[in-house]
């Protein structure tokens, strides 16, 4: 199954790090969409199917908390899992995001394994090998 993952961060280098991490975790076939702030992300979400969002907190125009609140208000996006990646790792901030509907929170700097493990927990292990039953013959793809 191919996923569509929206990466929202005002830092282009950080978006690149997250994309490389996703590809290394087996999500290389996923459609990886990018936005520099929550407002751009909301526009992308109007025209694209999104399976998961990874967002920063500190961004211009619409920060990550405002963005998560906006997503969770919309019927079409309220069930999309949102993971927050931020330098703000205090318990109060994490609780605030989780109370607004985020399903995960990773503090920067992070290890690639931290993002991979959380995404696998949310979306499941990626396995592109499928077996079709053809009677007495199995076909592996």
Which residue ranges define each predicted feature?
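CheY-like receiver
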Residues: 127-141
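Two-component/phosphorelay signaling modules centered on CheY-like receiver
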Residues: 12-33, 100
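Helix N-cap/capping motif at the beta->alpha junctions
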Residues: 34-43, 64
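Alpha4 helix (beta4-alpha4-beta5 surface) of REC/receiver domains from two-component response regulators
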Residues: 66, 89-104, 117
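Short amphipathic alpha-helix used as the core "switch/output" element in two-component signaling
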Residues: 43, 65-78
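Receiver (REC) domain active-site loop signature in two-component systems and cognate sites
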Residues: 59
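C-terminal output helix
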Residues: 110-119
